[in-house]
């Protein structure tokens, strides 16, 4: 899919490049982790700006040894937005994230740029996704602003965890949606998940349409939810 949209991503990338905000980075992941830099909430390293000030001569010398990835310079400023589920959220891009990747060394465009360009191109006005992507939002809002694109409204839902508090994973033998659909009707699955999220008092079958009239983000918990024991036997 990304290969089909490469031209669109390149156009946006070149706009950022023309602003003087893009620079080559030669740091490896292992080097960054070894530097004991602070970590972001999603587990990544806060980039310390190691390659931000390289001279043209230094860049040329480093290119002889490896192809660079490319990062976007971020300002030392707070970006605040109101999340539909989590409420007001503030992040300082420089301190909480650092300059972030726009393009990998192999030429593939990074998620942050691709998702912004894709959503704007498709006219997306509301984004509902997992709370594990909350920390990406400030970066994306910064890109929307630089590219002069309309930003959607965001709502980040708490994650549904296994009953013992770990992330659900096929590798650990947890239920996949595919397996559940083989044993339950769609209404059964929706109703039980609605119960787990506190949207109804018992795990009775429901359709998404029947939940809409009483839905409010205020009813959705702000913290991750452990799947009730025995909900899906």
Please give the residue ranges for each predicted region:
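Bulky hydrophobic/aromatic packing residues
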Residues: 1, 6, 81, 109, ...
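Active-site cores that bind ATP or allylic diphosphates and position pyrophosphate for catalysis
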Residues: 30-169, 176-180, 229-233
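Non-catalytic terminal extensions that flank enzyme cores
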Residues: 60-61, 77, 166-168, 172-233
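Residue-level detector of secondary-structure boundary/capping sites
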Residues: 4-7, 131, 184
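Conserved alpha/beta enzyme-core scaffolds, especially Rossmann-like or related mixed alpha/beta domains
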Residues: 1-31, 154, 192-211
